[in-house]
């Protein structure tokens, strides 16, 4: 397979591990060891990497790539981002209410009346639950909870993410309908 047409970042190579060319790899897969199941991985320049071995090690996976046989070669890979093509992701294994994060980026956030709140620009998990970042030109990005109450429906075909403004914290319970990031701050005396 040539360089991915629709690249999805699967991992990033970290520091060398040992003297035989192994590297520490941070994966972005549900199962970190699944990195070995995707076949060839590619860097941003299109160079391919074949996983020969992968084993867990604390918060990363230790990987041995074909052709990387010593510590110097392994150290040269530090910081390399690894990609696959979007078509290689196992869509058939997802439940109806599961999505790949990459498929949510760029969706338009709208409420039931059709009011737009921006596009999904990022997803975060800071430990308290997933958050969606909504960006709108000329405005500061907003974070909303990625919960069923705040985001009751996702339609990939239409390219929309239905938001419930109150549950998402986009509208206060009082009459003020401005999002939290646009409210006026009290003047200092």
UniProtKB/Swiss-Prot annotation:
One of its GO terms (molecular function) is ribosome binding. Keywords: Chaperone, Cytoplasm, Ribosome biogenesis, rRNA processing. GO terms for biological process: ribosomal small subunit biogenesis; rRNA processing. Pfam families: PRC_RimM (PF24986), RimM (PF01782). Its main location: cytoplasm. It is found in: Cytoplasm. Residues 96-169 form the PRC barrel domain. GO terms for cellular component: cytoplasm; ribosome. Residues 170-189 are annotated as: Disordered. Gene3D superfamilies: PRC-barrel domain (2.30.30.240), RimM (2.40.30.60). Belongs to the RimM family. The PRC barrel domain binds ribosomal protein uS19. An accessory protein needed during the final step in the assembly of 30S ribosomal subunit, possibly for assembly of the head region. Essential for efficient processing of 16S rRNA. May be needed both before and after RbfA during the maturation of 16S rRNA. It has affinity for free ribosomal 30S subunits but not for 70S ribosomes. Binds ribosomal protein uS19. This is Ribosome maturation factor RimM. It comes from Brucella anthropi (strain ATCC 49188 / DSM 6882 / CCUG 24695 / JCM 21032 / LMG 3331 / NBRC 15819 / NCTC 12168 / Alc 37) (Ochrobactrum anthropi). The gene is rimM.
